[in-house]
Structures are given as C-alpha cells and as structure tokens.
Amino acid sequence: MKYQFKTGIDSKEYDKFVRNFPSTSFMQTPAWSLVKTAWDNDYVGLYSDKKLVCGAMILKRNLFLGKKLFYIPRGFVTSYDNDEALKIFVKELKKYAKKNGAIDIKIDPFICFSEDNIQNIKKNKGIEVRKTFTLDTDKIVKKLENLGFVHGGFKKEVNAYIQPRYTMAISLRDKDGNFYEKEELRRTFPKNTRNYIGKYHEDRGVYFSYSTNKEDVKDLISVLNCTEERQHIALRSEKYFKKLMDAFPDNAVLFFARVDIDKYI
C-alpha cells in the first residue's frame, strides 16, 4: 500500500479527522493550540489513498542553541492496529523532527493502562468493571517501544509527567455495555455522593449551577485562591481559564456549588 506523509495540514481538515476519530483527546484538536500559545504548532499526518490514517498535532518549544522539543499531547491519533502505517508515520516524523532541529519527541498517547472502580481501590468492594480502553494496551506500548520510544515508567508524584497519570470518569454503561437509566446510574454512586444529588442538599442550602460565560471565571478563581493559600500551591491563572473558554466555546463549562450559610447552619 502506498502512503504519503504530509506536514502543514490545514487545521480544518485535521480538526475534522480528530473529531471523527473513535477515541482521542481534546488536546489533539487545533483548539488546544489556542490555549498553548507559548508553543509553535504543526499538523502532520500519513495518508493512504488520499485518506488521513495517522495524525498528530505537534507543539514545538524552542530550547537552547536553536534546538527544539517536539511534544505531541495525547497523541498520536491513530488506531495502532496498522503496523505498516504506524512504522512509516514514526519514521517520517523522526525525519521531520531532525530537519527542524528537534532533539526529542515526547508523546503521551491517549491509551489506558488499567481501569477500576474507585470503590474497589478504596474499600476492595469487588465491583466488576467493564473494560473499555485497556484491551490492547500492552501490545500498543510494545509497538511504540519497538519504534524507539522509551516508556516513562509509573511514577506516583503529581508533577512527574506533563499530563496526569490518572483520569476520573463516570461510566454511563453497565458491565454488559448497556446505557444506565438515570436512577440506575445514581445507584452506582457511593451513598455519601448520592446524598449530594437532588433535594437532600437543596433543602439544606446547597445549590449547584453551571455557566458558559467566561466572566464567571472570576468566581472560579476566588475558590482556587483559597485552595492555593490552604495547600501552599500555585494553580492556573484567570487568564488561562479564559483562554480555555475562548478556545472551546461549545464545550467549556464552569460548575459551581454555592452554600446559603444561614440555611445550612
């Protein structure tokens, strides 16, 4: 099969490719480059019969003496089951990196090493978990290692990696793959979590709301400032969150919980 590697792919074409791909991350969309403005970027891909089959949004950072770092957040965007295409894509990517003075290509692919229920981790509940994302993980990691990538290991420190190792998600399907009804989904939550849903806390003065207005970022920042002072840490700025709201106008949502102190007490 004949393949063609291209750089400088039109952002609209690449965005369509990413959005139509079965499993990928928002960090591979062109919108993410609007947030990471301190980095240069490019969209590259491998075509088969004029169809894009492998792709990557590359973030480029200038280092010393004209050298660069290539970082592909939550990429590549590919199914990993076409060994020939993956091999050619990586080979051409390395050539492109070398030509542009990159001394390292860092990737953190959107693949999952393991899946479990938080109740199993906390209390060893023995809850059966439907495996969705970990079916071929070992094979994919081995393929990438064979192509020259070095696995970063499994460190537990929060700042050990560019992106967090752990992702919390609520499964909307049962172990057989069927979507939960609303009340069924609610029953999957721990009891103390269920208490926060519905009238139980509303009657006690706790109210939940959401907003897509970036002017409300100031309310988020006021809470983050309290967290920074309490934990002695530094979190993201108001400017950063407003960038997110601008870059993802149809997807970025702010969620708030507010307490009526007089009623709650």
Predicted regions and their residues:
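Acyl-donor binding region in acyl/amide transferases
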Residues: 66-160
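A conserved beta-strand-loop-helix scaffold within acyl/acetyltransferase catalytic domains
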Residues: 3-49, 53-66, 111-114, 132-137, ...
